[in-house]
């Protein structure tokens, strides 16, 4: 039997395809970025959020350059489809992250869509926003496979110790 690694080979593609083509992908990313700047928290599929995250971080880096920087203004003008959000980028979001280098966003997985296609969903938000905090997922470590195996081992050892104590206390009398 021969194994194929065709799924792992990207053939020069370094990004997700997300839509009907390159132009559709850019429009989708622009709309998602505009929504993120406007609301500071959005919900989308995991693939879209993961792809958009780098662009959201880079947009803040350009915003930190200031509104007098020509390249920063061009990037903001291109990526934000609603032009009333450009001042928010430079006057609200960029000063919030002025002393920070990178890691401006938080991405959390949320339950999959139920009624449609069961797509893996996520929430992305800018850190330090005024929205109520999202509940961080709590993983119950007692339910991991390793911990379940250790628990079973402990129970077996405890049971064996009880059995050995019980057998040592019962004295067998010789039969005559």
Swiss-Prot record:
Residues 1-8 form a transit peptide. Disulfide bonds: none annotated. Its main location: mitochondrion. It is found in: Mitochondrion. InterPro entries: Ribosomal_bL17, Ribosomal_bL17_sf. One of its GO terms (molecular function) is protein domain specific binding. Pfam families: Ribosomal_L17. One of its GO terms (biological process) is translation. It comes from the Eukaryota. Keywords: Mitochondrion, Ribonucleoprotein, Ribosomal protein, Transit peptide. GO terms for cellular component: mitochondrial large ribosomal subunit; mitochondrion. Belongs to the bacterial ribosomal protein bL17 family. Component of the mitochondrial ribosome large subunit (39S) which comprises a 16S rRNA and about 50 distinct proteins. PANTHER family: LARGE RIBOSOMAL SUBUNIT PROTEIN BL17M (PTHR14413:SF16), RIBOSOMAL PROTEIN L17 (PTHR14413). NCBIfam families: L17. This is Large ribosomal subunit protein bL17m. It comes from Rattus norvegicus (Rat).
């Amino acid at each position: 039997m021969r194994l194929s690694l065709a799924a792992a080979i990207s053939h020069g593609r370094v990004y997700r395809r997300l839509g009907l083509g390159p132009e559709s992908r850019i429009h989708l990313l622009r709309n998602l970025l505009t929504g993120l700047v406007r609301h500071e928290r959005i919900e989308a599929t995991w693939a879209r959020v993961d792809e958009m995250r780098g662009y959201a971080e880079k947009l803040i880096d350009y915003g930190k350059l200031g509104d007098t920087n020509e390249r920063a203004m061009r990037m903001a003008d291109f990526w934000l489809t609603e032009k009333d959000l450009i001042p928010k980028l430079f006057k609200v979001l960029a000063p919030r992250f002025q002393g920070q280098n990178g890691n401006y966003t938080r991405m959390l997985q949320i339950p999959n869509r139920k009624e449609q296609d069961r797509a893996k969903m996520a929430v992305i938000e800018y850190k330090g926003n005024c929205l109520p905090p999202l509940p961080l997922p709590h993983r119950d470590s007692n339910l991991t496979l390793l911990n379940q195996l250790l628990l079973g081992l402990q129970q077996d050892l405890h049971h064996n110790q009880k059995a050995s104590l019980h057998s040592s206390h019962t004295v067998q009398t010789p039969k005559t």
